[in-house]
Regions:
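Conserved histidines in hydrophobic membrane contexts and catalytic metal-binding motifs
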Residues: 1-480
């Protein structure tokens, strides 16, 4: 009764696995590398470490004037920092962002490699790197390390090579003049056999996000089908001989059979969760706010009232000022360190004392008014199953529970870090937990977690190598 369906599964497994077996080995091996060397990114500590002291005398226009000059509608944030060529406002809205010089409100886009080189060199010096031999390399829309979508608003990017011992390279946004990415020689080398291989990330493919998204999703689904069909066939091929379970296969094929059954649970969950990493809203919600939700949480801030410029008495420790809309009020965020800041309400004028972070009751009022049906807001414990950290280490992350939906709000900036509905909470376990082993019990035991990941991935790679041998022998038979 099961012969014909089983034969179909054998053929599916065989002809999907022959072209995919090399990919399986690559995925397992590169997964080990990725665990220890993630894809290059500019950390918040690195970004903040490259910020300079304000030249207050050159901040001649107010945030209100910057918002008006930007011509952007629905502004939610304004940021001020000192660039090597003077202080700059960055006005942000859902529709985009615009950088303006704070002394005369001219557009602050970067138009020359000399300015980009000066910005990169100053950033490097402030971080304690050596920019003495820094050179401009190129202006490019994409390269291997700048393909992620989060950089789209900054393209094209100026590449600055420091030519230091570590082989550090910096990327300067042509739109804002910010350093948006850094890499080292070691990071680049390891990532070619790590993230680039694992995510199938060649620049020519990844720069077209839609093509990459569809191609890798279908490729991953084919891998799921190959693994599942192999598991079913492997179970049906088992035989009982004299009270023993035996395999009908010999040599490499037997090794493939037994190893496949032994690591079936890990291989299946890892391949399925890897496929789910490419979901991007296909089966599960994305965790992002809708435009309507974002607008209601921001409220209708009166940017025209933000007419005061930066006072001469500004603390010399201040490296960045941000104004953000939250519940219709404008908060001013003075950052004096990567983990130190002061928040105050400036519009409407308030006599409330400044505090480092937003409080639970403030967030509860805003989210309850914007969304409705909220029962509570409280700080999320670091060992919570759905914890996300703020970019400012000591800052609490608050969770507002509104019916079936949870809103996770950064106490440092008022930003929504993630919207967790039932689908998203399920996705957290099916993808993140199963693919990266970020189970709370393992996250507090990083060495144990690393050991488990390395051992299981090595086991999976070994199993996949037996598949390569079996596939090669099958192909030789087919084309003999």
């Amino acid at each position: 009764m099961v012969v014909r369906p089983l034969r179909t599964l054998v053929l599916i497994h065989r002809w999907l696995s022959i072209p995919l077996c090399l990919l399986f080995v690559m995925w397992f091996a590169s997964g080990i590398v990725m665990h220890f060397v993630p894809f290059p990114a500019l950390t918040e500590a690195e970004r903040f470490g490259g910020l300079s002291v304000f030249d207050v005398s050159k901040v001649r226009h107010s945030p209100a004037e910057a918002v008006a000059a930007s011509t952007l509608k629905g502004v939610t944030r304004v940021r001020l920092w000192q660039r090597s060529d003077g202080p700059v406002y960055l006005v942000s809205a859902a529709s985009g962002m615009k950088a303006l010089h704070a002394d005369d409100l001219r557009a602050a886009d970067i138009g020359s490699e000399q300015v980009a080189l000066a910005i990169g060199s100053e950033h490097a010096r402030l971080r304690g790197l050596n920019p003495a031999a820094a050179t401009f390399v190129e202006l490019a829309e994409y390269d291997q390390w700048t393909v992620p979508n989060g950089l789209d608003g900054h393209r094209p990017l100026y590449l600055i090579a420091l030519n230091d011992v570590a082989g550090t390279e910096l990327y300067v946004s042509s739109r804002t003049g910010e350093i948006v990415r850094d890499t080292t020689r070691s990071e680049r080398a390891w990532n070619y056999v790590g993230s680039v291989a694992h995510w199938i990330y060649p620049t020519a493919l990844r720069k077209d996000w839609m093509t990459w998204n569809v191609a890798v999703w279908w490729l991953s689904l084919a891998a799921v089908i190959a693994a599942l069909s192999g598991l079913i066939v492997g179970l049906f091929r088992l035989r009982r001989v004299r009270d023993r379970i035996v395999s009908p296969f010999r040599k490499w094929h037997a090794w493939h059979h037994w190893l496949g059954l032994a690591c079936a649970a890990f291989v299946m969950t890892w391949i399925v969760s890897g496929w789910l990493s490419m979901d991007h809203g296909r089966l599960f919600s994305t965790g992002a706010l809708t435009r309507s939700e974002a607008d209601r949480i921001a409220g209708t801030p009166a940017w025209v009232e933000l007419t005061a410029t930066v006072p001469a008495s500004l603390s010399p420790a201040t490296r960045e000022i941000e104004w953000f809309a939250f519940g219709g009020r404008i908060h001013q965020r003075n950052r004096t360190g990567v983990d130190a800041q002061q928040l105050s309400i400036v519009v409407p004028a308030s006599t409330a004392p400044a505090s480092p972070f937003l409080q639970a009751d403030q967030i509860n009022v805003v989210i309850s008014h914007a969304v409705g049906g909220c029962s509570s807001t409280s700080a999320v414990a670091p060992d919570d199953h759905y914890f996300l950290a703020s970019e400012v280490a000591p800052a609490p992350v608050y969770r507002s529970i509104c019916g079936d939906v949870w809103y996770q709000i950064d106490g440092a900036s008022g930003a929504n870090l993630e919207k967790l509905d039932a689908q998203r909470r399920t996705y957290r376990w099916l993808y993140r937990a199963l693919h990266t082993f970020d189970f709370p019990a393992l996250m507090v035991r990083p060495k144990l977690r690393s050991a488990i990941i390395v051992v299981l991935c090595a086991f999976g790679a070994t199993f996949s190598i037996t598949g390569i041998v079996v596939a090669w022998r099958r192909l030789k038979l087919e084309f003999r």
